[in-house]
Design a protein with these regions (language model features):
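Metal-dependent phosphodiesterase/phospholipase catalytic core, i.e.
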Residues: 2-120, 133-136, 140, 147, ...
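Thr-Gly-centered strand-to-loop micro-motif
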Residues: 140-141, 162-163
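Short acidic, glycine/proline-enriched helix-loop-strand junctions
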Residues: 149-162
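Catalytic cores of alpha/beta
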Residues: 166
Length: 166
């Protein structure tokens, strides 16, 4: 899920944390208001389902955003890392979040999985900040992506990939 609430991307409403897995499975997650059935009815995949699929797609590298910047879900980092390791995908995953402390925790728990900061506002010395926190990716909002960020990140051997808002 992209948002804390299911309203925008599904035919349901309410906060994800208020819904059971069974209730989430009943929702159509095809952006009904935006795409009006263009892709048919889609069910929300679990992380496990996604990782199972990804394990078969050998050339795929993916970014998984931990959705814990508005509401923190204790233990999420460990559970996600355990599942990634279960499928042997450590070298094909980038874990990112707007909650930088969460990504630092991920990197402390498993240094083999790349980490990235999602950033919505201007950050001085972005490369130094990210490198100090031991992440490999810096994902700024395009509005705040400046030449100095790219230079700072390059000098600190970081990958810069702009944040895409859907």
């Amino acid at each position: 899920m992209h948002d804390e609430k299911v309203d925008r991307t599904t035919d349901g409403n309410g906060y994800i944390y208020d819904l059971t897995y069974a209730e989430l499975c009943k929702l159509d997650c095809s952006y009904p208001d935006k795409f009006a059935g263009k892709f048919g009815r889609l069910q929300i995949p679990t992380l496990r389902e996604y990782l199972e699929w990804m394990a078969e797609e050998e050339d795929l590298i993916t970014n998984i955003e931990l959705k814990n910047s508005v509401y923190y879900y204790g233990g999420m980092e460990e559970k996600v890392i355990d599942m990634i390791c279960e499928y042997g995908l450590e070298d094909r995953i980038i874990l990112s979040s707007f909650n930088n402390a969460s990504i630092v925790l991920c990197r402390q728990n498993d240094e083999t999985i790349a980490g990235g900061f999602l950033v919505e506002k201007y950050v001085d010395n972005a490369g130094v900040y990210a490198r100090t926190c031991d992440v490999q990716y810096y994902h700024p909002n395009l509005e705040y992506l400046k030449e100095e960020h790219v230079r700072s990140c390059s000098q600190n051997e970081l990958n810069v990939e702009r944040l895409i808002v859907t």
